[in-house]
Curated annotation (Swiss-Prot):
Species the sequence originates in: Protochlamydia amoebophila (strain UWE25)
Reaction(s) the record says it catalyses: a ribonucleoside 5'-phosphate + H2O = a ribonucleoside + phosphate
SUPFAM superfamilies cross-referenced by the UniProt entry: SurE-like
Descriptive protein name: 5'-nucleotidase SurE
Family statement: Belongs to the SurE nucleotidase family.
Keywords from the named record: Cytoplasm, Hydrolase, Metal-binding, Nucleotide-binding
Cellular location(s): Cytoplasm
Primary location: cytoplasm
PANTHER family: 5'-NUCLEOTIDASE SURE (PTHR30457), 5'_3'-NUCLEOTIDASE SURE (PTHR30457:SF12)
Top EC class of this enzyme: hydrolase
Pfam families: SurE (PF01975)
Cofactor entry: a divalent metal cation
Binding-site positions, a divalent metal cation: D12, D13, S43, N100
Keyword Lipid metabolism: no
Gene name linked to the record: surE
Length: 261
């Protein structure tokens, strides 16, 4: 290893996804990079971990790339756990995840394996950045690569508060160039319940696919959802910490404990 900072690179689209190669390529001059990513796509697995079967770590050869790459037959959170405890020679200064094919903005972060990989690191005291790109069907990663080094370099040079990480989303670029980057707040949008009922052609039982309908809201003008629709890239500082609703606790503690005891 050199004297450069060490960055762990991961994702949820899988170790051979184009997005992670573009992420690696965009920041390879900033730090020593080690890639530990899922063997297969693990989209929408959130912060799940594998506990009912063994996990395997395998060295991966990226053609035409001098990269240190490993795959894990598990989830993004599994990858981070094994990277920190088995693969990496030392503690990384930063973890980056992505570039995800499709945005992870609003409340969709709770489903995202891309974001969950960073959350796993944050819970172990390591800051991180999740990167996602709105062009799902035909992502032109080269159009957003130039924005990534500045964001990563800022994170390397400016310590985040404990429990904090950055969630970065790039808008679709099919309608024009990105207008700029905004540090902003999380919106409300998420994938709504929209199950599609289907009939098996050879069997009599029905089955369902969860649809891709979005639950839309009137978004604040400083939210990531609103700004992405306007063509801006968004950076939201998210926080993992005490989830207790303290105002509810203070208001209801006496009444609740009197009622149930």
């Amino acid at each position: 290893m050199s004297s450069k900072p060490l960055i762990l690179v991961t994702n949820d689209d899988g170790v051979h996804a184009k997005g992670i190669r573009h992420l690696w390529q965009s920041i390879q001059d900033l730090a020593d990079l080690i890639i530990v990513a899922p063997q297969q796509e693990q989209s929408a697995v959130s912060l799940s971990i594998t506990v009912r079967r063994p996990l395997h770590i395998e060295k991966v050869d990226w053609l035409n790339a001098q990269a240190d790459v490993w795959s894990v037959n598990g989830t993004p959170a599994d990858c981070v756990k094994l990277a920190l405890n088995v693969v990496l020679p030392k503690r990384p200064q930063l973890i980056v995840s992505g570039i995800n094919r499709g945005t992870n903005a609003g409340r969709n972060i709770f489903y995202s394996g891309t974001v969950a990989a960073i959350m796993e690191g944050v819970m172990q005291g390591i800051p991180g950045i999740a990167f996602s790109y709105g062009d799902y069907f035909n992502p032109s990663y080269h159009l957003i690569e130039s924005f990534i080094p500045g964001i990563v370099n800022y994170a390397l040079q400016n310590a985040m508060q404990e429990g904090t990480f950055l969630n970065v989303n790039f808008p679709k670029t099919e309608h024009g160039p990105i207008k700029g980057i905004r540090l902003t707040t999380q919106g409300k949008e998420y994938w709504a319940e929209n199950p599609e009922k289907r009939q098996h052609p050879a069997e009599q039982n029905s089955y369902y696919w969860l649809g891709s309908k979005l639950a839309e809201y009137d978004e604040r003008e400083d939210s990531d959802i609103f700004l992405l629709r306007k063509g801006f890239a968004t950076v939201v500082p998210l926080h993992i910490g005490d989830l207790t609703n303290h105002s509810h606790l203070l208001k209801e503690k006496l009444a609740f404990e009197t009622f149930v005891n």
